[in-house]
């Protein structure tokens, strides 16, 4: 422990002297109030400290005390359903302890509840050899999540004691005799520094799709479990709703939602909606699998920088248990702005648009902690982290540094489009500019699993949309009637794909989520109509006759998005109905 004195205060940056024994990334207690800060730069005996609380009223001469430890999170039972701030202070218990709706400065509250007792069930017995990552036992944390208590990193040896029963997170639950003869006494809780990724046995190639229930994503721009995706878009384009939808319905075990520098009412929406929503996979409340980290725009700027790392470290902990985890960061642009502010106060040479020169490497550090891995331990386990980051470029300009550095790393780009949002087409993901580099892997995975030609259907549907885009300019110049019959059919089918398939209402109880079998049935109906109508045109039928003769069945195709999942056969039955009606048009003499 080293004690120094403050010499300057500049917003969230405090410079202290007499800190020659301190290290970079040490946590400090700053001033008489004991504010939490982290050393980010050392020059001789002077330490530059990033303070995670409001610094008004702090002045030169006040003491700074280092703890000798890096910024770390507590990992153990009690994380799920909890809401933390950027440095893992539990907001619910913080409010009760301080009796205030605001963050009172200098208050230290343990991240995990020290009084709560958890029922521990051992999975191993005394005398067994264990290595780091082995599961010693389990705690039923919520109705959905079984918390697996693991041997901490760098601990291995013989299990000499393990106890069943109800324990707090600090009680000794097991003892391991290590190779050097020392006894390691372990509890249900462990700590981990947030800026250091948790080690794994092996990184694997992600192939299994993350099913979100959003048709435009799952069909055209899928992300895998263990992949990384970015959602850039201008104000009002629907970034937050896309993030909320994925958090609600993604087929993962655990969701970490990081509200980083965005409006507080967005976190309020999460708190109001999530407890009422039922997870379609488990039948339990979605809150039973969710961890919330709130660092909203009215909270200290410096803590935004920590909140992203706090979230990804908690995600890695659950991944190591063998779970699939999705982490949403809304928004990484606000996090980058916090980096820019600290860089400016440190008087570093600025890069593009004032962001620090190391912006790209910091963004990469975050996204590269996602992935599909084989975890440590003698038991074979796989875990995944899917990282989805919203980016808020000013004015929707994706050429700015945060978006460009993000796109260098992630493999999925869901580009939100202001014109689509203004036309009330949601999700406003532009199908012409967005992309997914997982498309081929996911397509072949689904073809193999479902025994279907899904990837072929997706390619055909995208070709229709691209053909429509090339025809639109001709239509604007000389009108729709000047097109050939086949091209008019392309325009009609593309409109069906856009309005009846891609457009989705997040606030409709049925349309908000579409399972994969329903997506396939809906897309098959539209493509069948295109195929049969194209054949009819080649046999001499007229476009207008086909459209009039199939008006009823096309209306039913359009309404199929509102048919509940349990009535899936109704949607599948429309395929034959389409063929029958077009054949009827031909039989009537449309030649």
Curated annotation (Swiss-Prot):
Keywords, in A-Z order: ATP synthesis, ATP-binding, Hydrogen ion transport, Ion transport, Nucleotide-binding, Translocase, Transport
The keyword Transcription is annotated on this UniProt entry: no
Entry GO MF terms: ATP binding; proton-transporting ATP synthase activity, rotational mechanism; proton-transporting ATPase activity, rotational mechanism
Keyword Translocase: yes
Pfam families according to UniProt: ATP-synt_ab, ATP-synt_ab_N, ATP-synt_ab_Xtn, ATP-synt_VA_C
Intrachain disulfide bonds: none
Gene Ontology CC annotation, any one: proton-transporting ATP synthase complex
Function noted in UniProt: Produces ATP from ADP in the presence of a proton gradient across the membrane. The V-type alpha chain is a catalytic subunit.
PANTHER family: H(+)-TRANSPORTING TWO-SECTOR ATPASE (PTHR43607:SF1), V-TYPE PROTON ATPASE CATALYTIC SUBUNIT A (PTHR43607)
Protein name: V-type ATP synthase alpha chain
Organism of origin: Streptococcus pyogenes serotype M49 (strain NZ131)
């Amino acid at each position: 422990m080293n004690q120094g004195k403050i010499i300057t205060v500049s917003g969230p940056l405090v410079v202290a002297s007499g800190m020659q024994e301190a290290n970079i990334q040490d946590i400090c207690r700053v001033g008489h109030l004991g504010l939490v800060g982290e050393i980010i730069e050392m020059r001789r005996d002077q330490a530059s400290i990033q303070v995670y609380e409001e610094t008004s009223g702090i002045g030169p001469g006040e003491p700074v005390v280092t703890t000798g430890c890096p910024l770390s999170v507590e990992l153990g039972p009690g994380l799920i359903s909890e809401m933390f701030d950027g440095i893992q202070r539990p907001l619910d218990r913080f409010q009760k302890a301080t009796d205030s709706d605001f963050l009172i400065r200098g208050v230290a509250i343990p991240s995990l509840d020290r009084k709560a007792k958890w029922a521990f069930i051992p999975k191993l017995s005394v005398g067994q050899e264990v290595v780091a990552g082995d599961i010693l036992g389990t705690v039923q944390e919520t109705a959905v999540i079984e918390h697996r208590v693991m041997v901490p990193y760098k601990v291995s040896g013989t299990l000499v004691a393990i106890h069943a029963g109800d324990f707090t997170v600090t009680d000794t639950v097991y003892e391991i005799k290590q190779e050097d003869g020392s006894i390691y006494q372990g509890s249900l809780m462990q700590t981990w520094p947030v800026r250091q990724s948790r080690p794994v046995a092996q990184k694997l190639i992600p192939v299994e799709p993350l099913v979100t229930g959003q048709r435009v994503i799952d069909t055209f721009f899928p992300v895998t479990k263990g992949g990384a995706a970015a959602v850039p878009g201008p104000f009002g384009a629907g970034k937050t709703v896309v993030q909320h939808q994925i958090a609600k319905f993604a087929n993962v075990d655990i969701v970490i939602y990081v509200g980083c520098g965005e409006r507080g009412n967005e976190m309020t929406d999460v708190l109001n909606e999530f407890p009422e929503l039922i997870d379609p996979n488990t039948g339990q409340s979605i809150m039973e699998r969710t961890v919330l980290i709130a660092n909203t725009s009215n909270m200290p700027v410096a803590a935004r920088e920590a909140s992203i790392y706090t979230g990804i470290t908690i995600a890695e902990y659950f991944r190591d248990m063998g779970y699939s985890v999705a982490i949403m960061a809304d928004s990484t642009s606000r996090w980058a702005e916090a980096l820019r502010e600290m860089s400016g106060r440190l008087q570093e040479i600025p890069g593009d648009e004032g962001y620090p020169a190391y912006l790209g490497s910091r963004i990469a550090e975050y996204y590269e902690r996602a992935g599909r891995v084989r975890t440590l331990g003698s038991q074979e386990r796989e875990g995944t982290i899917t990282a989805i980051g919203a980016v808020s470029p000013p004015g929707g300009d994706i050429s700015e540094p945060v978006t460009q550095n993000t796109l260098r790393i992630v493999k999925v780009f869901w580009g939100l489009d202001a014109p689509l949002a203004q036309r009330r087409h949601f999700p406003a993901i532009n199908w012409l500019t967005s992309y997914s580099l997982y498309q081929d892997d996911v397509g072949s995975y689904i073809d193999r699993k479902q025994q279907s030609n899904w990837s072929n259907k997706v390619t055909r549907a995208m070709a229709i949309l691209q053909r429509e885009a090339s025809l639109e300019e001709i239509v604007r110049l000389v009108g729709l009637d000047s097109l050939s019959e086949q091209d008019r059919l392309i325009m009609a089918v593309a409109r069906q794909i856009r309005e009846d398939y891609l457009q989705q209402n997040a606030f409709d109880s049925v349309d908000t989520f579409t399972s994969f079998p329903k997506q396939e049935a809906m897309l098959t109906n539209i493509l069948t109509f295109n195929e049969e109508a194209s054949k009819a045109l080649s046999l001499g039928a007229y476009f207008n006759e086909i459209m009039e003769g199939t008006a009823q069945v096309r209306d039913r195709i359009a309404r199929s998005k509102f048919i509940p999942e349990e009535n899936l056969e109704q949607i599948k039955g429309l395929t034959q109905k389409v063929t029958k009606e077009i054949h009827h048009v031909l039989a009537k003499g449309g030649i």
